[in-house]
């Protein structure tokens, strides 16, 4: 296609001045071949980084799905554990609870790995929409919620609520609710985007199989 034309164009452009030069001592006039080699090499440079779109999309989806599973399930377990001993989940701890189970923490390494992994995947080109945009919102919300949950876990594990009559526990609960309210709708959108793209990929694979079998 285009590179072939560029090569011919480059050759004619470099060869023309050689022909139009005044009669120079015969075969020694061939140093003009060096620029020809340079001109031929130029079109190859932009053509080299060939992007395999499907490979990039697969890499992105692999990270997105793994991180969803690494974070979503532990978050649900944490919420269930916390709700176990609260009379009113929205109100939070009152200080009158007979049993205090605390809350399950979220793996800090999973939070850190997923934050780095998701943001690196989003930066890969070409973009994969709608999920790239949602993935950033999801990981930001998940990290904020995870950090608050881990602070709560430490507070309850160390039984600090016995020293401050749940004062910090009540403050942490308000931060937790704000984080949770931000996280839940984004998590739903993220899950929907994963399903939407997976459905498209499955349809594309089915078409490929049908085309191959048809032939």
PLM region spans:
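Sec-dependent bacterial lipoprotein signal peptides
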Residues: 1-3
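Bacterial signal peptide processing site
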Residues: 5-8
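Post-signal peptide N-terminal segment of mature Sec-exported envelope proteins
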Residues: 13-56
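General "foldedness" signal
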Residues: 14, 78-81, 159, 204, ...
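Leu/Val/Ala/Ile-rich N-terminal alpha-helices, chiefly Sec-type signal peptides and the beginnings
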Residues: 42-181, 188
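Extended amphipathic alpha-helical interaction segments
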Residues: 169-215
